[in-house]
Regions:
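Extended serine/threonine-enriched, polar tracts that run as long, contiguous segments within proteins
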Residues: 142-219
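Generic surface-pattern signal
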Residues: 49, 53, 180-187, 219, ...
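Generic detector of well-ordered alpha-helical segments enriched in charged/polar residues
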Residues: 7, 41, 45, 176-183, ...
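Intrinsic-disorder-associated interaction segments
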Residues: 37, 78, 168-171, 175, ...
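OB-fold ssDNA-binding interfaces and closely related basic DNA-contact patches used
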Residues: 1-158
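Long, highly charged low-complexity segments enriched in Glu/Asp and Lys/Arg with interspersed Ser/Thr
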Residues: 96-99, 204-248
Length: 248
């Protein structure tokens, strides 16, 4: 084969590759999730014996400190380091909490708590609270005294029980932006597989912290999406009273 013919064939192949449509993640597929392809739902109901789930039964992943880009995930042999978390976000909460003391002991219940960042446990409107103002936290410029976060219920491929992932306030807008992009495609949050990664960032005060990033990597098929809705019913029925600690 002469060089001219070879060059012609190579150019034809390159043009065909460029013309081919990219793989579309929005084409639904079966994800192979253990919880969605077995009798996991029946097993959970049988083992719980009609008892509601509580926060303490969920494994919790907190935001890493010091700008670390590695998650610490509870496992059977202790904490396991993972660079990313992939799963189906069944649901989420937007809690917030306030401590009257500047440095409470870890595990101390907050002075005030809200499950949705809108109304406190005693019925007050969070938007009208002075501790919701920027700069209200002592010793930190422009920080709020009332601590916000996002709590995700993440169903992972090899588990039949969702993992709780706490997203700090510094990444709250990034998560809400992600959910908004899904809405723009008329896609429920729970119908996609989400990948969560971390990026090191630095605050205006020079303190390192981790930014959360969210990407949709797969869309569930109709049968799996229906099973996800059944799992969501269990989460919604759970007695989830978020446990807050100052040292996240």
């Amino acid at each position: 084969m002469d060089a001219t013919n070879l060059k012609t064939r190579m150019n034809t192949k390159v043009q065909a590759m460029e013309a081919a449509p990219p793989e579309d993640l929005w084409n639904p597929s079966d994800s192979g999730y253990l919880a969605l392809s077995s009798n996991a739902l029946d097993l959970i109901k049988e083992n719980l014996k009609q008892q509601s789930l509580s926060f303490q039964l969920f494994d919790l992943v907190k935001s890493p400190s010091g700008g670390s880009t590695v998650f610490s995930v509870p496992g059977l042999s202790g904490e396991e380091a993972e660079k990313e978390l992939t799963g189906i976000i069944l649901d989420y909460m937007t809690p917030r909490a306030y401590w009257a003391t500047p440095d409470p002991v870890e595990g101390t219940p907050p002075t005030c708590l809200s499950k949705d960042s809108l109304i406190s446990a005693d019925g007050k409107v969070c938007a009208h609270c002075p501790f919701n103002d920027f700069g209200s936290k002592d010793g930190e410029s422009n920080a709020k005294a009332c601590k916000e976060s996002v709590l995700l219920f993440l169903l992972r491929p090899g588990s039949v029980f969702p993992l709780l992932v706490r997203v700090p306030v510094t990444s709250k807008k990034l998560f809400l932006k992600y959910t908004t992009r899904l809405v723009s495609r008329l896609t429920p949050l729970s119908s996609v597989v989400t990948k969560i990664t971390l990026e090191k960032a630095t605050s205006r005060e020079g303190k390192p912290y981790a930014l959360f990033h969210f990407d949709a990597v797969e869309v569930l098929g109709s049968e799996e999406a229906e099973k996800v809705r059944e799992f969501m019913d269990i989460v919604h029925a759970a007695d989830v009273e978020p446990v807050f600690t100052e040292a996240d």
